[in-house]
Regions:
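Primarily recognizes Gram-negative and organellar outer-membrane beta-barrels
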Residues: 1-228
């Protein structure tokens, strides 16, 4: 602008707007069967599904580019480009599990089980560009991306519980095998596969000190896996 705020070299307006959505879908089914001879002996079958789809649709637009006579030069020199981004992501997980518990005598309990988890992370982001002031959007490969990340997780666990007077002792372990598949459909990045396993020990100890007093301690470990 000039000193009188009336003359100017160039000017333009920008408009940024968009909309998005986020959902959480969860469900589970359990079936449990108890032994007629011993009510503490039971087997449980479980299924669980979780899904978290998200969308994002945004625009950045240049408007009222002036002076009109120099409009194209302004667009070229300042690299003014409208863009439209249309993105979708989702993390979906299905879990199948079976658990078995049985007492051995009055003091001992054995727990064992197995689990299969199928986890699918996906991201699809389409990017479009148009010359400033134009709505002729063209899909741009260089700035778009599409990505898939699959995990197949198989695990088994075993645990033992000893209850004697005011003492409760629970050691156990869990073994997990993960098969990972990553694929870049659009955008930079190389597809890769990975397999790895983990052995996770756990232990807890509880002591009853009185009618309202308990002392507890333990060790456990959780495994965190990448999402989107």
């Amino acid at each position: 602008y000039g000193s009188d705020h009336q003359s100017f070299a160039y000017r333009y307006n920008t408009d940024n707007h968009g909309k998005g959505s986020w959902y959480s879908i969860n469900g589970n089914v359990d079936y449990q069967r108890t032994s007629k001879k011993n009510k503490e002996r039971m087997i449980t079958f479980s299924y669980k599904i979780n899904s978290h789809p998200q969308t994002n649709d945004s625009y950045n637009t240049y408007l009222n580019i002036e002076p009109e006579a120099d409009r194209q030069d302004i667009i070229d020199n300042l690299l003014l480009k409208n863009f439209h981004s249309d993105g979708k992501t989702n993390t979906m997980e299905q879990t199948f599990q079976v658990d078995f518990t049985t007492p051995i005598g009055k003091l001992h309990t054995i727990e064992t089980g197995a689990k299969y988890i199928f986890r699918r992370n996906s991201s699809d982001n389409k990017f479009y560009e148009a010359e400033g002031g134009s709505e002729d959007y063209v899909y741009t490969d260089d700035r778009s991306s599409e990505y898939r990340h699959l995990n197949h997780i198989i695990s088994a666990y075993a645990g033992y519980t000893l209850k004697y007077k005011g003492l409760t002792f629970k050691p156990g372990f869990r073994y997990e095998q993960t098969v990972q598949r990553v694929k870049y459909i659009v955008g930079p990045g190389e597809d890769f596969n990975a397999n790895f396993s983990d052995l996770v020990p756990s232990v807890s100890l509880g002591i009853k000190l009185g009618k309202t007093q308990n002392l507890r301690g333990g060790y456990n470990m959780r495994i965190w896996r990448p999402g989107i």
